[in-house]
Amino acid sequence: MYITPEPCWAWMYHHDEDKLALELGEDWLFLSPFSARHLIPDSLHGAAFSAQHADYYNDVLDRLRKQLPNSAPEVVQIALNLTAAHFFSLPMMPKSWFFQTSAHIAYACNGKLVELDTGSERARFAVVDGGEQSSLLMLLEQSLALGNKKTMKQFELIKVMNDRLSPCQSLKHRRIVAA
């Protein structure tokens, strides 16, 4: 079942878990993977889940549902993480050098799935914030080795130039294993 935004939803910073969280009701809390060092300072003081947040969430949820074979709770988790990242992540500079230039460039729009190629491995990402030149992306795979002993974990963010984005291949057969 897909959940729809409610007026009671509110962002808060969960200090015990060191994560941005979304209160979904009295006894229901969604923990994002984002800690304070990746978030803008305003996110640490809480905020309402605004109409702008709801619009973004609904848009990416609809786009993800059409692209992923995952269960509703897994797709909701990805959509909520995209929403948190879109509104509360710190600005980043592109780190395109980790990835090969794509022969078939994918257009970047929020919630779209794309692939990046490190030269030794391909991985799926969701577009958090698609720009004209570069885009902020969220890793959907469990992990991705970038080289120089650097590894990305699921739901980590990276910004890259759009010439690195490739269309995803055979999405309906490959589920994302969400943590």
From Swiss-Prot:
Keywords: Cell cycle, Cell division, Cytoplasm, Septation. Pfam families: ZapC_C (PF07126), ZapC_N (PF21083). GO terms for biological process: division septum assembly; FtsZ-dependent cytokinesis. Disulfide bonds: none annotated. Its main location: cytoplasm. InterPro entries: ZapC (IPR009809), ZapC_C (IPR048372), ZapC_N (IPR048373). GO terms for cellular component: cytoplasm. It is found in: Cytoplasm. HAMAP family: ZapC. Belongs to the ZapC family. Contributes to the efficiency of the cell division process by stabilizing the polymeric form of the cell division protein FtsZ. Acts by promoting interactions between FtsZ protofilaments and suppressing the GTPase activity of FtsZ. Interacts directly with FtsZ. This is Cell division protein ZapC. It comes from Ferrimonas balearica (strain DSM 9799 / CCM 4581 / KCTC 23876 / PAT). The gene is zapC.
